[in-house]
Every structure is written in structure tokens, then in C-alpha cells.
Amino acid sequence: MSNSRQHQGHFARKRFGQNFLVDHGVIDAIVAAIRPERGERMVEIGPGLGALTGPVIARLATPDSPLHAVELDRDLIGRLKQRFGELLELHEGDALAFDFGSLALPGEKPSLRIIGNLPYNISSPLLFHLMSFAPVVIDQHFMLQNEVVERMVAEPGTKAFSRLSVMLQYRYVMDKLIDVPPESFQPPPKVDSAIVRMIPHAPHELPAVDPAVLGEVVTAAFSQRRKMLRNTLGGYRDLVDFDALGFDLARRAEDVGVDEYVRVAQAACAARAGR
């Protein structure tokens, strides 16, 4: 595969993190994993040159129920409009600032499916941005840097287990589906990639905790990975009775599971509410 940044007459822009998927076998495998169906409400983040967009539209879109897409590159928007017409409704702008909830169908049930080959330079911030729309989302299928996917699905007690692992596992059930080598892209990235499926937990499955406080606790815990939690979570001792929780502070952040972090955040919330 050529290392040229040009593909189909378009120069991939580094500032947009553009690497275009060109391997038809991988594209077919991704579409098979997504299983788009006619009439579903689906949005693609960063459709690029339409490698995934085309096969998805063929299975899903009608003029009355188009595929939605969020794209920042104006040059690509013109090409996509010309190619797909009324079967693709484009939203020009930055996915990090886009209100995905605005695309959900009316009603209480989740209705939105989100897909995309996410720009690797903004993948973590974008995943956190999308968390706020989880109540209206059926599922998400993303191409990401393999290292990020490994962190997303990592188990406690492993080096890959991180703040990203805790926060996303709190909100989603996640599975790594497909490994994708660099040569599947033009230009090839310098890293391996993978497809991940993310399904939000149902409301009744979510622990009753303020996500902001959970994020605060987890961020503190992972702020100095090599230090014991007695140091990184020491500031919470006036709020949380760690002994009563059965929470051992003589551990490092990566050794603590999601449920334990939730209990600490719940205790911190309760203590603050009682003051």
C-alpha cells in the first residue's frame, strides 16, 4: 500500500486525523458487524470519502430516512453530497461539539445508532463527549487505535486498565470485534486499529451515582499510577470511611474494579449532601 496522503483525488489532512479505509474485506466485515437495517436512525462520524458510508446507505437509507453524518472537512462534504444526494444528510461541524441527542427519534426508548472511523487524535475526548448521549443510543461501532480499544475493554489488574476503562465500562458493555492492520488504510497509520462495539447499559442497570463525582474520584486515583491509593485518594478520607466500605487503600488504581470506584463516589456524594 502506498504511503501517499492522496486518495481518490483528496489529500488526507493530518490536522483532521484522516486515514481513509480502503480494504474492502475489512469494510464488508464492519458492515456485517453493524447490521444496518432499513429505516434505522443512524449517524456516521467522519464519513471521509464514503468507504463505509456507501455500503451502509445501501442497506439502511431511503430519501425519507437518510443516513446522517457529521463531517468537518468542507472539501469532503461537497464530494459526499454529490455522491449520495438525499440518501445522506450531512451536518457540517466538529463532532466534539455536536449535539447527537438532536438526531434521536421522539420517545423514551433509545433510537440512535452511531458508527465511524474516528480520528485517532481526538478519540478519547470524543468517547467522553458521546457518554452524555448514551440514554438515546442503541449502540456504537467505532474504528479506533488498537491500543485505545485494549484500554476500553481491559480488566482490573492489567497495565491497560485506566481511567478510560473505568468510565466507559461504567456506562457501556464493550467488545473488541475486528483487528485492522495499517495497510487497510490510505495513508497507512503508524499503529494497528480495531473495531469496538459499545452498548449502553439500560437505565435500571446503572448504579445510582453522579457521573461527575465518579469521574472526579477516578481521575484522582489514576493521577499518579505508580502511587498507592492512600496517596491519590487521601483527600477523600474526610468524606469516605474506606474501612466501612471494605476498600483497601494499599493498592494501585489499576487494581480496583468499576464497582468499587462507584461505591467510593456514592459515599462521597452522600457525605457532601449531608453537610
Swiss-Prot record:
SUPFAM superfamilies for this protein: S-adenosyl-L-methionine-dependent methyltransferases
Electron transport as UniProt keyword: no
Enzyme Commission number(s) of this protein: 2.1.1.182
GO CC annotations, alphabetized: cytosol
Superkingdom per UniProt: Bacteria
Binding site for S-adenosyl-L-methionine: N19, L21, G46, E71, D94, N117
Keyword Transferase: yes
Key words of the record: Cytoplasm, Methyltransferase, RNA-binding, rRNA processing, S-adenosyl-L-methionine, Transferase
Reactions catalysed: adenosine(1518)/adenosine(1519) in 16S rRNA + 4 S-adenosyl-L-methionine = N(6)-dimethyladenosine(1518)/N(6)-dimethyladenosine(1519) in 16S rRNA + 4 S-adenosyl-L-homocysteine + 4 H(+)
A Pfam family assignment: RrnaAD
Function text: Specifically dimethylates two adjacent adenosines (A1518 and A1519) in the loop of a conserved hairpin near the 3'-end of 16S rRNA in the 30S particle. May play a critical role in biogenesis of 30S subunits.
EC primary class: transferase
Gene3D superfamilies, A to Z: Ribosomal RNA adenine dimethylase-like, domain 2, Vaccinia Virus protein VP39
Designated gene of the protein: rsmA
Name of the molecule in the record: Ribosomal RNA small subunit methyltransferase A
